[in-house]
Amino acid sequence: MIILDFSQFLPDIGSGFIIGFVIGWAAKKAIKVVAFLIGIYILSLLYLAKIGVISINKEAFSALLGNLENSLLVFGDKIIGLIHSFSFGTSFLIGFGLGFKKG
């Protein structure tokens, strides 16, 4: 009969969860700050365009947003590959999810 001592796995599980929670919480806070700054920037551009100080090339702006979307998708794929390479990936993902939810 094989007796398994689960206490040897606790440091990996616990550290993965804690690291995931902190990174998830920080990621959500960072996303909120970046979204706020982008919103302020876009609003300032729209205001300047409305009063005639600048002119916005709508086609180039749409292309820029499309390129940004593709870049974010590629970055997301790389992050997923990185998470899968962690030995404590499951607890990391659970911690990340909870940290993201709480952040």
From Swiss-Prot:
InterPro entries, per the entry: FUN14 (IPR007014)
Membrane topology summary: Multi-pass membrane protein
Membrane in keyword set: yes
Listed Pfam families: FUN14
Transmembrane regions listed in the UniProt entry: 6-26, 34-54, 79-99
Record keywords: Cell membrane, Membrane, Transmembrane, Transmembrane helix
GO cellular component assignments: plasma membrane
Subcellular localization: Cell membrane
Keyword flag Cell membrane: yes
Superkingdom classification of source: Archaea
Family from the record: Belongs to the FUN14 family.
The protein's name: Uncharacterized protein MJ0067
